[in-house]
Amino acid sequence: MAIGNVSVVLVHGAWADGSSWSKVIERLEGQGIRAVAAPLPLTSLQDDVAALNRTLERIDGPVVLAGHAYAGAVIGSAHAENIKALVYVTALAPDEGETVGEVFYRAEPHPQAPRLAPDQHGLIWLPDEAFPAAFAQHAASQELAVLRAVQRPIAVACIGEPVGRPLWKDVPSWFLLAEDDRMIVPATQRYMAERMKATIKPHAVDHTPSVTAPTVVADIIRDAIRSVSYN
């Protein structure tokens, strides 16, 4: 199987949209790798998995799935037969019966992590000041302005629904461990990555490396593609 025959599906997390992957897409496409960003409604975990499955239905051939943050739970809940590997970009990986909230809050939060609470509509928004403080502290001011402008809230239902048997038990996985992450502390990332038996790639990046360190992200995705292409 040639590298160019593998498609990459990129899945955004909370407070973001598909544009957060734009720099990664540029790097993958520049290497002849087709990449598609899957849009999520962020209304419930079930809704998000259904949306991802609709994107996967449109793709022929083998797929490497990459998810950022909350989207780790989404890619782990997909079960399309053409998924050959998973890439967790400082992402949450609940095990069977666990919720996103349980793994997110399993450790003491970083001192600069924002306090999160739903509004009257059951939606959780990221405060503006949290973008430079914790979400993407390595980003340039122009990048932060865009991240704030396009943020999409996540519904409480997304983080309270237990997951089924995760796909990472059945296909190989890679984990970008963000050592400077202030949203999902590194200890929590390592706990999840080790129990997944993932190939762990630690880097001194923040919570949103798709924006602030896209080459690092693209290189790890390419490693996953190469592994499934030659095995």
Which functions belong to the PLM regions below?
Residues 82-128, 155-162, 192:
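Flexible "cap/lid" loop of the alpha/beta hydrolase fold
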Residues 4-61:
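Active-site catalytic motif of lipid deacylating hydrolases and related acyltransferases
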Residues 6, 168-173, 196-198:
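Short, proline-enriched alpha-helix->beta-strand connector loops that line the catalytic pocket
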Residues 3, 58-61, 169, 224-230:
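Glycine-rich phosphate-binding loop signature in dinucleotide/nucleotide-binding domains
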Residues 66-75:
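Gly/Ala-rich beta-loop-alpha elbow adjacent to hydrolase catalytic centers
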Residues 146-167:
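Active-site nucleophile elbow and catalytic-triad environment of alpha/beta-hydrolase enzymes
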Residues 179-204, 208-211, 216, 223-224:
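Conserved loop-alpha-helix segment in the C-terminal half of the alpha/beta-hydrolase fold
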Residues 175-177:
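Short beta-strand/loop motif that positions the catalytic acidic residue
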